[in-house]
Structures are given as structure tokens and as C-alpha cells.
Amino acid sequence: MDPKRLLIFRAVARAGSISGAARDLGWTQPAVSQHLRALERSVGCALLLRGAGGVELTEPGRVLLVRADALAVQLHMAEEELADLSALRRGRVRLAAYPSAAATLVPRAIAGLRSRHPDIDVELTEAEPPEALDLLNAGDVDLAVVFSYGDDPVDTPGLRWTPLAGEPVALVVGADHAAGRRKRLTLRDLADEPWIVGCARCRAHTLLLCADAGFEPRVRHISDDYVVVQNLVAVGLGVTLLPRSALEAYRHPDVTVREHASFGTRTYGIVHREGAEQVPATAALVRELSA
């Protein structure tokens, strides 16, 4: 049953005549009659009795009019809901972000979005990049903030990756560590130190840098939590490399931070499925994250 023809039938029933419905719809009378005949053929019975004074509903016509009224109500509700979504009067965005972004970039973006569009809800899930991409591919989130090192580009088949900015990676040692007082410092100088590493991508970056410096680090501790990592460093249990955003999110008072171009940079950005940028609420959050 064609919904369009069902709504035309409803217009005729409400107007009481084919000519009246044609005027209401802005159609020609023959076009309305043609759709009515096609609808009656599809249901296999007469829906209207035509007469000089207009039309009269048959019993099947009265039954069908109830359904046609319900369809019209549902379509009107859909139009209103879509209008609200388009105007950002309502909406929801499910966002995944790695820990340091979730502590710095994301709160600012959500606050900015809320100030402009208070009826948009953002649901945040903390996830490292591989897990965030899995969530995207599974349809469990709409948007992800992820990072990539130059030696480990974001692999996003079927997804759109938009880099936002780069951030330096810093060496972090205890405040009383001799390396923190050196004017010139290389990773090679720390070849004999115990190392603390983080997530898989960060760990791979550290191992690659150390290999380029001519040694394999003695990894003693593994943690994705930059607070845990800095506390371990602060009490002399190892040294580590951390991106600037992790140090902006939390800076232990008993660590020394040294930045150098040789420690590399990390690029962060936004990933989403193709077409998601056309969803109003998602597009609004992307703008805030990119600001």
C-alpha cells in the first residue's frame, strides 16, 4: 500500500470531495482520481462512493481512514523531530576519546557545545585509539578522538580521519634525577634506566625511538594512566615519554620534563564514519573539537 496514496485518500475523505481535496493538495482533479483508483485496486475494494454532492466513505474506507489519520500524525511528529534535530534543539552524540584528550580537549569542547546548544547531549566513553576505532566500526559511538605517531599512522578503512594538531612528546624523569639537570640530553643517556611505557601505540613509539638511539629499553612498568606513570617516575622507579596533553592534564610536582625534537610528536584528530559529518549534532561537536 502506497503511503502517498493513503494520504491522498485521507485528504479526499476530510474534504468530502475529490475537487476539494485537489484544491487543498494543489493538484489537478484527474491526478487525485487516478491515485484513488490505484489505491482501490491495491486494496481490492471500493473505499469511496462518488456522487454529485461529493464522496461517501464505504465501510472499508472508514476503517482505512483511521489508519490514514494515524499515519498523518506519525509523519507530522517525524517532521517536527527532524526539524528539532536540524535546528539543534535536540540531539545526541556518542564520543570516544583517549584519556588525556578526555581530560583536556573534550571537556572544553562539550562545554562550548552546551553553551551554544544546551539540548544536545554528549555521551563520553574513554578508549585508546584501537578500541575507539572498534567502537566506531561497531556503531557504538558516532565520533572518536584518536592520536597517531608519525611511525604509526591511523588506519581507518571506511572511516574519515581529520587531523587537528600535533603535540610534542617529552621525556619525564624524577625531579632529583641527574638527567633533568643536563643541558644536552639524548635518549641514549638513559639506556641503563628502567622504563615505564603506556598503551600499545605509545609503547611502540618509545621502543622505536630507543632503537634509533641504539638500545632496547628495560621496560619495568606498563600503565595507560598518566597519573600512575608520573607517580612511578616521581619516586624514582623509572623514566618515561609522555605527550604534552598528558602533562597538561596532570603534572606531578616531583618530576622534571624535557622536550626535544628527537623525542617526536603525536598528531591527534577526529575519526567518524562517512556521512556522519552531515548529522547536525555530530557536526556541531566536530566544530567545537576543531576550534
Locate the predicted segments by residue.
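Short helix-boundary/capping micro-motifs
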Residues: 11-26
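Alpha-helical linker/hinge and terminal dimerization helices associated
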Residues: 42-43, 64-86, 147
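Secondary-structure junction motif
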Residues: 147, 179, 193-213, 278-286
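Flexible hinge/capping segments at coil-to-helix
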Residues: 156-169, 173-195
